[in-house]
Amino acid sequence: MESPEWIVLDIDGVLIGIESSYDLAVKRTVEKLWTKLGHDGSISLETIRDFRKKGQFGDDYRVTEGLTLAGLNEDLKKFVEEFPRGEKLECIINRTGERVGKEKVKPIFDRIYLGKKDSPSEYGLWRQEKPLVDTSLLDKVAEQFKLGYITGRSRQELRLASKVLNHELSDAVTREDFLKPDPRALTHLVGESSGIYAGDTHNDGLLVENYNEETEGTFDFVMIDPDNPINQVLRDLLDKK
């Protein structure tokens, strides 16, 4: 792609490190649900990250429910290792014949991640998030391209991300709009255009694949990981402009 019109970025794991926030909120929620269901166990942060990267979940409520169900019925580490890339929560529900339900996951997860004024200090994990991106690069990208964001966060959580970065994240699609990998998330933001989408999971790649198949637009996907960090990707884009 010679000159993309849009640069679209995921937020969690790309712009913001979530190891001590979302990852930990999933862990604590899964373990609390297991206790309520009479199961004694623990889950590693590595297992959570591997599971999220492989599956087609859209938000961490679904990640949490999937891990809760899997751990009740199977060896969790083996389950995640063998989990088919791109599969959904429904695959686990069908396999186990059970479900937990968002209505049981969300109150626990939100209290841990968002916190409450009357909560113990362990809650409000969003405060532990750290920027991964040099926000001056976002400003430079916005001068050269159209810049937007697609995230599994809610609008409330998006505002918290802006606080963490001390940078306004405008032109954003949140989970109230569409869940990835629904291509309408990208269409809603860019229409049918050319661009680059940077994310850190297989689900992000599926979003781009679905968009290219179902619209006249053309997007390339860039996987962000420790060997290909977002700051380097943005610098390379600016150098090529």
Give each language-model segment a name.
Residues R28-K32, L67, G71, V164, ...:
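Short alpha-helical scaffold segments that flank and stabilize functional sites
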Residues E19, F57, L179:
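Flexible, glycine- and charge-enriched loops at secondary-structure boundaries
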Residues T35-D40, E74, E168, T218:
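Generic macromolecular interface patches on structured domains
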Residues M1-I7, W126, V133-V141, G148-I150, ...:
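Asp-based, Mg2+/Mn2+-dependent phosphohydrolase catalytic module
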Residues L33-L37, G71, D75, L237-K241:
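Solvent-exposed amphipathic alpha-helical surface segments
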Residues R52-K146:
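A metal-dependent, Asp-based hydrolase signature
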Residues M1-R49, R62-E65:
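Active-site neighborhood of HAD-like aspartate-dependent phosphohydrolases
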